[in-house]
Amino acid sequence: MAEKQTLIDAINDRFNSQIEAVVAGVDMVTIELLPTHLLEVCTALRDDPPFNFELLLDVCGVDYLEYGMSPWRTEETPNTGFSRGFEEVIQEQIIPWNKPRFAVVYHLLSLRHNHRIRLKTYVEGDPPLVPSVIKIWSSADWYEREAFDLYGIVFEGHPDLRRLLTDYGFVGHPFRKDFPLIGEVELRYDAAQQRCVYEPVSIQPRVLVPKVIRVDSRYEKGEKENG
């Protein structure tokens, strides 16, 4: 705990006007900052002796769409059940939220001091834009590509910002909260055309599909004898 407080004090002394907040979480310290200060703060966290966060462990996106909203209050008995699966439910804002929809989170490690730290910056725009940290930590390359692919967050200055997990013709960003659970289209190989083709999604909403009971060969013999 004392080491964590020492780190917080050093952060406040060094970045007083460049950060929005410092939160002492259970697992690690979290810094919230604006995208305009991201590169300057990251460079100092890597190079300044009190920090020496020379290793970038992860970069990920977060979608706060409908954050803090709920179709009912937990202290009340809900009046909707099965119908929630296919009917629109009016949601209420339970937890106030006035920040941008998207955020980018960075996890750093100092091998010298054995410290971990988390950076969080909220990004605005359509598409949401944030500076790339690839020139500070080269390991950001695929992390930023993944966040771009899944959330549509654009990392300005990235030399090769292509999709990483989905195919290059994929439509949309699958980790966004408003992306359809069954997807927009499905991909299959067409032997006649000898290429992959996109088709409308053939999956049915499972909430309306009766339980499928498959034929079990273990019972076929007994049924024939009884028949």
Swiss-Prot record:
Claim: Translocase is one of the keywords in the record: yes
GO molecular function: NADH dehydrogenase (ubiquinone) activity; NADH:ubiquinone reductase (non-electrogenic) activity; quinone binding
Signal peptide (UniProt feature, chain positions): none
EC number in record: 7.1.1.-
Keywords noted in UniProt: Cell inner membrane, Cell membrane, Membrane, NAD, Quinone, Translocase, Transport, Ubiquinone
Membrane topology note: Peripheral membrane protein
Pfam family name, one: Complex1_30kDa
Enzyme class: translocase
TM annotation in the entry: none
Known role: NDH-1 shuttles electrons from NADH, via FMN and iron-sulfur (Fe-S) centers, to quinones in the respiratory chain. The immediate electron acceptor for the enzyme in this species is believed to be ubiquinone. Couples the redox reaction to proton translocation (for every two electrons transferred, four hydrogen ions are translocated across the cytoplasmic membrane), and thus conserves the redox energy in a proton gradient.
NCBIfam families: NuoC_fam, PRK06074.1-1
Protein name: NADH-quinone oxidoreductase subunit C
The organism of origin for this protein: Coxiella burnetii (strain RSA 493 / Nine Mile phase I)
Gene: nuoC
